[in-house]
Amino acid sequence: MTKNKKPTHFDAIIIGSGPGGEGAAMGLTKAGLNVAVIERENSVGGGCTHWGTIPSKALRHAVSRIIEYNQNPLYCKNNSSLHSTFSQILGHAQDVVNKQTRMRQGFYDRNKCSLIFGEASFIDAHTVRVKNADNSTDLYSADKFVIATGSRPYHPEGVDFDHSRVYDSDSILQLEHDPRHIIIYGAGVIGSEYASIFRGLGVKVDLINTRHRLLEFLDNEISDSLSYHLWNSGAMIRNGETFEKIEGTDDSIILHLESGKKMRADCLLYANGRTGNTDKLNLNKVGLTPDSRGQLAVNQNYCTDVDHVYAVGDVIGYPSLASAAYDQGRFVAQAITTGEAQGSLIDHIPTGIYTIPEISSVGKTEQQLTADKVPYEVGRSQFKHLARAQIAGTEVGSLKILFHRETKEILGIHCFGERAAEIIHIGQAIMEQKGDGNTIDYFVNTTFNYPTMAEAYRVAALNGLNRLF
């Protein structure tokens, strides 16, 4: 039953309250527009806050602190150790999610942005129908629309996700038992992160990689470091494998691989790909057709093929990062209010991968520079040689700077180790400097606090410059 026969009208309607939707909403409301955000769940934040970035990183942080405690020589001498299960640390993750949700709700309230909870679908080019929790519906119209519905785990045919022992990267957060052995199918960013988390809790892990090496987009040395660290922690990595079938029993999962191998575990996490959340929007009513992955094509202003409909975030594909989605939302607000986005995503977007230890990189890899025949040199710093790492007990890891032999321009930075996603931003800031500002000499000529992890840049710079002749 539709409660309002005449649609409630807004200047702009944003579908989805994740980072992209939030960025667009804040920009548009601050510009004075009458804005509504439609969210299908019962609280704001989107997948990033509720099933993706925030809970998984909270889990990772809790596990890494347990590992750090148990490896600290002081506590080892006193025969003191911590043990926790996946279900126990889920409570910590939920606390963080609740804090994030309350904070983001406050953003909308303070900016007088209308929040509508329900599932939206187009009925014509300027009108959406919203299905409410009580199955009633309401109509809303707008001059402009922003689609920021995000993505969800890909569910291939042949995998029974209704089985109680089969999970995807969303449902794993509702894991109701504590497995002793888990199979993770898919060794991308999500699969590798969860492999680290479960192995850190002492769970036996089989990580099935459909490619020939882990995270092939990374610099080879960093990818190899992750492979070694997972192997050294006891994880079993199987590269170049694809599944033939997944067989479920009452208390286990049997994975059959096309190579003939098979393995049994308490449960399986399928983490191999994502698809855009566009299938329930009735986009044909507005004249749009998503691609096979549920994604929409946009121009430099994030406008789709329909000039009053924009899209941001995972639903448009690369780079599929929460940080980038928020920026895209801001740019859309500019495009709607002024006719053109006043900015664009930077050329070198940093990668942050929250394995244990972390991985982060920005710029070119060694294999890319070699293929392009760029005369580069390498500067390295091992964390085990840094006083701060020795004090903190985080000696596993390294920082690598790639720079041009002749101009000394920084071309790429790659970090493996605790706090890598934070450390990378120092180098990123220098890489973004114009002209002669981007030079490895900066790290030699500046004075760092001591002892700090930032000192790794000075050590790596000196190491690299000493290779020149």
Curated annotation (Swiss-Prot):
Binds 1 FAD per subunit. FAD binds at residues 39-48. GO terms for biological process: 2-oxoglutarate metabolic process; NADP metabolic process. The keyword Iron does not apply. The keyword NADP applies. GO terms for cellular component: cytosol. Its EC number is 1.6.1.1. Its cofactor is FAD. One of its GO terms (molecular function) is NAD(P)+ transhydrogenase (Si-specific) activity. Pfam families: Pyr_redox_2, Pyr_redox_dim. It comes from the Bacteria. Keywords: Cytoplasm, FAD, Flavoprotein, NAD, NADP, Oxidoreductase. Its main location: cytoplasm. It catalyses: NAD(+) + NADPH = NADH + NADP(+). It is found in: Cytoplasm. InterPro entries: Class-I_Pyr_Nuc-Dis_Oxidored, FAD/NAD-bd_sf, FAD/NAD-binding_dom, FAD/NAD-linked_Rdtase_dimer_sf, Pyr_nuc-diS_OxRdtase, Pyr_nucl-diS_OxRdtase_dimer, STH_gammaproteobact. Coiled coil: none annotated. Belongs to the class-I pyridine nucleotide-disulfide oxidoreductase family. Conversion of NADPH, generated by peripheral catabolic pathways, to NADH, which can enter the respiratory chain for energy generation. This is Soluble pyridine nucleotide transhydrogenase. It comes from Photobacterium profundum (strain SS9). The gene is sthA.
